[in-house]
């Protein structure tokens, strides 16, 4: 971690601040457009592969980057076409593409806890599971103040295990999620609170 703790207002403009800003600007590229379409994002991604040598493209969130070429009203067909375009881009440019896709509204179970979503809870349901190579769940447990990362799908079993999971806690001093090992004190303030 470049900062070794969370920066404060007094850090703005210091050498360390400038060094960190330079690192971010040299290693992260934000595609900022007035209107996002899948084709325009992939075109800009291809440009960044050629000019900057990027190896990873993150689309966050999925529902804000629309595929305007799709004329099909069927959400499953739309999702399949969307994922196919991304797969073709990833193979052509040898780039990892990560799509952040939020589930539809999740309801509480009989114990009052929010149900854990699956890939089928994303709009376009089964296509997310069928057409993607990998699927990870990131799910918060507000009571335990932990975040679970669970493998929902691995296409090639030598790359991971379906159902594998790890738990993390937010460490405010560093601004990082760290592996969860002990109970968290009840008065700890979490970033989503």
Regions inferred by a protein language model and the residue ranges of each:
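Short, ordered loop/turn segments at secondary-structure junctions
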Residues: 62, 102-103, 140-141
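Hydrophobic/aromatic beta-strand patches that form the interior of the parallel beta-sheet core
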Residues: 29-31, 98, 136
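Phosphate-binding/switch loop-helix module in NTP-utilizing enzymes
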Residues: 29-92
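Structural recognition of the conserved hydrophobic beta-strand(s) that form the central parallel beta-sheet
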Residues: 58-59, 95-102
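C-terminal regions of RecA-like/P-loop NTPase motor modules
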Residues: 2-11, 15, 23, 38-57, ...
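Short, active-site-adjacent cap segments at secondary-structure transitions
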Residues: 64-66, 104-108
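A short helix-to-beta-strand connector/capping loop
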Residues: 18-29
């Amino acid at each position: 971690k470049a900062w070794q703790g969370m920066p404060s207002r007094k850090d703005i403009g210091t050498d360390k601040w400038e060094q960190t800003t330079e690192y971010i600007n040299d290693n992260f590229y934000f595609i900022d457009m007035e209107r996002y379409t899948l084709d325009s994002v992939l075109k800009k991604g291809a440009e960044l592969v050629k000019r900057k040598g990027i190896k990873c493209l993150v689309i966050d969130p999925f529902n804000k980057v629309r595929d305007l070429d799709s004329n099909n009203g069927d959400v499953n067909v739309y999702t399949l076409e969307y994922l196919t375009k991304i797969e073709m881009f990833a193979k052509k440019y040898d780039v990892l593409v990560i799509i952040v896709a939020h589930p539809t509204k999740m309801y509480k179970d009989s114990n009052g806890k929010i149900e854990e979503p699956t890939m089928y809870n994303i709009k376009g349901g089964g296509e997310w599971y069928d057409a993607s190579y990998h699927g990870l769940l990131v799910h918060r447990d507000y009571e335990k103040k932990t975040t679970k990362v669970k493998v929902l799908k691995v296409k090639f079993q030598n790359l991971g295990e379906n159902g594998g999971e790890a738990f993390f806690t937010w460490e405010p001093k560093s601004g990082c999620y760290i592996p969860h090992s002990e109970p968290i004190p009840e008065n700890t303030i979490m970033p989503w609170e």
